[in-house]
Amino acid sequence: GRVEPEEIVKLYIEKGYDGIVVTDHYSPMTFEPNWCPQKQIDFYLSGYRRMKAEAEKSGKDFTVLLGMELRHYGTANDYLIYGIDEGFLYSAGNLMKPWEKKMYSLCHSKGFLVFQAHPFRTGIRRCDEHYIDGIEIYNGKTNEKLNKKAEVWARESGKLMCSGSDFHTKAHTARGG
């Protein structure tokens, strides 16, 4: 992102939020190619850890939860994963390798939820709905028409629904609902 993690916590507290789920990108573009898995996870968790520390320091009742926006190799699709923890990340290996069916099975074996993020953006393909629990029906950086299409798909398929700001700059603050 383009905003320091500590500043993100302050922005959301100012907007009256009680918490945030940090779903940083975990994709082939996130890491240097020569990084070992340990270094990748340390890097991936750094923003979350800084946000969690800032929330504790603030003295406010503000919860910071760990999530993930996962992209597999060779695709533009993004998947939001809720419920993950640090131990899982260090033990799971390279999460960009397993595709939808295998990833869904792995996540469900741990009690995590998998949502397709912004499914109607250009370049994204709608995934097999058997391998997701839900659909992001509102994305703060996606136009209203495409968000509405996502909501219709979620309702028709009986999937859970979520909303996100897709925070990358201060202008995206609190745009997720």
Briefly describe each language-model feature range.
Residues 120, 160-170:
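Acidic, metal-binding active-site segment of PIN/NYN-like and related structure-specific nucleases
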Residues 1-101, 130, 134-157, 169-172:
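A metal-dependent hydrolase metal-coordination microenvironment
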Residues 174-177:
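Short, intrinsically disordered, charge-balanced linker/junction segments flanking boundaries
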Residues 2, 110, 115-127, 143-145:
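Active-site-proximal loop/helix segments of hydrolase catalytic cores
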Residues 93-121:
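Internal catalytic-core helix/loop-beta-alpha segment
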Residues 67-69, 117, 164:
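Conserved beta-strand termini and adjacent loop/short-helix elements that scaffold enzyme active sites
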